[in-house]
């Protein structure tokens, strides 16, 4: 149905709330609020013009709806700086007056749908076809006018283009004046919305109809779903029967009576996950009987509502950008978000994958990003939807300063990678020190007990018990874990220190033998090429690694 009707390092922003959905407001000055509200209002205006006038869809419909709801929230938060909410259909009206206004639909969530259905009878549901709305006016059995939805009252003249569509009967048996409202959609045989999403089908139709000419191939790709007959029979069954006789059969095929909420939910789920010949973005619930067309207005009515499918993309506000640095020096930017719900999951953070990706997107606190769930329900950033009016400078780590042989000590700028080394060392693929995690290492580091990767070897129960946050029992358990680490076998220690992968190479139980190997000797081992051979030699030759070896040798650890 119609698109634009909606009710709906660490650097932190000064936001007090986890989400606007909780009715909290940004902690902005009046000047900042005015700038942010004006910027969003202008962005919405640009999107409206692109869609309704130019036939382009620069942003997904569900993101548009969320952006409009965000502006409404901000206007409520800052009434003194509120920007007049842009009329979605401003600039889209054409010269032709609709014989019956297009109403649009209120979009309800599950709880609101339950309440709406509870007070009504004779209810029906249809797929909410994802296309562009149109009025068709027939007289003497022939199409007299086709009018774009426009602002609901006036629209553009699409008659010449719509007459070329094979989806419309060329001649009707009915001679009297007929007024039909429906959706022009792009044909997608076997389309499963839950798997394929909208596939920009709506934008494709809008773009084609914005052209001056329409070729035969494109015309054949456009279908028609008539969803109402304003001057037709008062009864829904009679309207569906009449439309089928006139040659508009899809309405009957995809209209179902619903006696209760469970049935409505069942059809919504079915149409979301089963093949349909078109894209759809939810279902429409409507009363079988509604007021006659002459009483309709260009605003959401009380007799029909939309219940959208689960969001494929969520609009999320970036609260912070954190740069995670792994033990090998890989830098992974991570966005901290105001929590958003997507497919029944609450998303609080999302990784960007690489420093290059972050630089390409140039994401900063305050920006609004589109989030979707990728394979295995992993959240990912699709795009920056719009940028904050005020964008603070955001320093980032230097990639040249972080690599496989950097940050063996907690020097300035090395804290993150050093902690990652400790985390690996004590983890399951390292020394497997059960109960010793990142929090333990952070506590020891904050108390000045870790000058290098093996500083913990010197900590006994008495020294640990002196530290804030360590009781007698926890100190005893941790000291036992540290003592047990000394007894771990040589290969386990090599992995824990960060030995580059050695494939199927035979590793003698002696540090001296391994450290004495050159690249040529390493390449004689199965699975080791020139690059890996150089990495292995560099590891054993690095001064910090050699210093760790001396610590372990002095501690009596096997193999060193």
UniProtKB/Swiss-Prot annotation:
EC nos: 6.5.1.2
SUPFAM superfamilies with a match to the protein in the record: DNA ligase/mRNA capping enzyme, catalytic domain, Nucleic acid-binding proteins, RuvA domain 2-like
GO BP annotations, alphabetical order: DNA repair; DNA replication
Keyword Signal: no
Superkingdom as given in the UniProt entry: Bacteria
Gene Ontology MF, one: DNA ligase (NAD+) activity
Catalytic activity: NAD(+) + (deoxyribonucleotide)n-3'-hydroxyl + 5'-phospho-(deoxyribonucleotide)m = (deoxyribonucleotide)n+m + AMP + beta-nicotinamide D-nucleotide
Keywords of the record: DNA damage, DNA repair, DNA replication, Ligase, NAD
Entry annotation: catalytic residues: 128
Family: Belongs to the NAD-dependent DNA ligase family. LigB subfamily.
Protein's UniProt name: DNA ligase B
Organism: Azotobacter vinelandii (strain DJ / ATCC BAA-1303)
Lineage: Bacteria, Pseudomonadati, Pseudomonadota, Gammaproteobacteria, Pseudomonadales
